[in-house]
A protein has these predicted regions:
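FAD-binding subdomain of flavoenzyme oxidoreductases
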Residues: 1-179
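C-terminal substrate-recognition/cap domain of FAD-linked oxidoreductases
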Residues: 139, 145-476
Length: 476
């Protein structure tokens, strides 16, 4: 449908990222959106009519009257005609297109308030499955199978630029930028409009192998990708500049793509979101959660906390596995060594190995204690635990006072503090067990990390930032 519309210079608005795996009936049943939802709405806004088979085998045809050719909630009252036909009344028409033969068994009109299809600040109201008795739409297939639909097509304005906004500050502070940008472009300055706006969080950026456009040399905490369209290039350019200025106010940097090729490159990362499953080499559980845009920051912040808790717990699981590995290595003794030093007796080698294992055990013990302390006191200010952390090898006493009054959670979120296997354990193990002689020891310890890491749970978010629909994904 999207390709046929494009060939005629038109746009099919309900074009989700999962288009390759989607069908038209599914789009209606889910009230699907996509990146163009911010401009033209979801399926319900773009449907003229649809046909479906109910559980009794009867045909239903739902036809919207007096369509406003815009978003449904902008119309005070919305009317639908609902016609019921028998199972055998749908026949092949003269043009080969199915059509109904004879009068419907039953017809009725359904009149609904346009506002009931939306909740304030939301793209759709998923709590209202009944929708006043309107069949098919947003029912997820529960009241029948949708077989066909007639859609409104749109004309895309001729001028378009894609903006990519990278945010490096706290995620909760960055997310309100979505509201800023949408509020600005909802005014249609000089006719410029937002034709698509999508969000990727840090977990997704890692999964898709995102190449940061900024020169900062760090992965952003959040990326927004949006299309700005309009009738004149000048209006679109000015709107893009203002959007970047709004991003700058929230620790963001902006980049603009003008040519079709560069715009496609900007959107390529968004299209690869299924790569999140790479983290576990498996599949992902998807949950769509609809959040009011003005509360998206709270949701993002809470998800970040879950990820930090899960990450630390996974590393504590790792310390237990490493302790067992060190015990196993001690039991094996010099037999684990790859080769012996000439002139060094087996007794001397055993003593050297025991000393190294003892030091490794002490490092592991202190690291585990540090991580456990942080996990148990995320909401406490740094200053409360700085003395104990210093005893465990993490000296925060010299931090500026304004840093020490922050919560441990805040410092972990912005990476002022890190819980790092590589820096705190792996590098220390490599120092203690250097060279070819100890390569089997290092291999054993690093294999522990790989095994335990695969059991880590984390949550990744990407959002249709224009309609509040947050895809919350847990790779399994």
């Amino acid at each position: 449908v999207a390709e046929a519309a494009e060939a005629k210079g038109l746009v099919f608005a309900v074009d989700p990222t999962s288009a390759d795996a989607s069908c038209v009936g599914g789009n209606v049943a889910m009230n699907a959106g996509g990146k163009k939802a911010v401009l033209w709405g979801t399926a319900i806004d773009n449907l003229l009519s649809w046909r479906m088979v109910d559980p009794n085998g009867d045909w239903l045809e739902v036809v919207r009257h007096h369509h406003n050719m815009g978003k449904i909630h902008d119309q005070a009252w919305v009317e639908f005609a609902i016609h019921r036909y028998g199972p055998k009344q749908l026949v092949a028409g003269s043009q080969g297109t199915p059509e109904f033969k004879g009068a419907p068994i039953e017809s009725r009109m359904l009149k609904l308030e346009g506002q009931r299809f939306r909740r304030l600040g939301l793209g759709k109201d998923v709590t209202d499955k009944v929708l006043g008795g309107l069949p098919g739409i947003q029912k997820e297939g529960c009241d029948g199978l949708i077989t066909s639909a007639v859609w409104v097509l749109h004309r895309m304005p001729p001028c378009v630029r894609t903006v990519c906004l990278e945010y490096f500050g706290n995620a909760q502070e960055a997310v309100p930028s979505i509201v800023d940008i949408k509020a600005y472009l909802d005014q249609k300055p000089e006719g410029a409009m937002l034709a698509g706006l999508e969000h990727l969080d840090e977990r997704y950026l890692r999964a898709v192998g995102y190449s940061t456009k900024s020169k900062r040399g760090a992965l952003p905490k959040m990326v927004l990708i949006g299309d700005i369209v309009g009738e004149t290039d000048e209006a679109v350019a000015r709107a893009a500049s203002e959007v970047i200025r709004l991003a700058n106010q929230r620790s963001g940097e902006g980049f603009v793509a003008v040519s079709a090729e560069s715009r496609k490159t900007f959107w390529a990362d968004r299209a690869r979101t299924a790569a999140i499953a790479r983290h576990t080499n498996a599949f992902k559980i998807n949950e769509d959660v609809v959040i009011p845009l003005n509360r998206m920051g709270e949701y993002t912040n809470a998800i970040e906390r879950i990820n930090i808790e899960c990450s630390i717990n996974n590393k504590l699981k790792l310390t237990r596995a490493l302790r067992q590995a060190l015990n196993d290595i001690a039991d094996q003794g010099v037999r684990i060594l790859n080769r012996t030093e000439e002139g060094e007796s087996p007794e001397a080698q055993q003593r050297s190995l025991e000393q190294r294992l003892e030091e490794a055990g002490e490092i592991l013990k202190n690291t585990e204690s540090r991580w456990a302390l942080m996990a148990a006191h995320l909401d406490d200010p740094v200053v409360e635990h700085a003395p104990r952390l210093a005893e465990l090898g993490l000296d925060l006493l010299a931090w500026p006072q304004n840093q020490k009054t922050r919560r441990l959670l805040d410092c972990l979120q912005d990476r002022t503090l890190r819980v790092s296997w590589k820096r705190e354990l792996r590098d220390e193990f490599r120092r203690l067990f250097p060279g070819l002689a100890f390569s089997n020891v290092i291999e054993r310890l690093e294999a522990c990390h790989v095994r335990v890491l695969r059991s880590r749970v984390f949550v990744a978010l990407h959002m249709h930032a224009g309609d509040g629909n947050v895809h919350t994904n847990l790779p399994v």
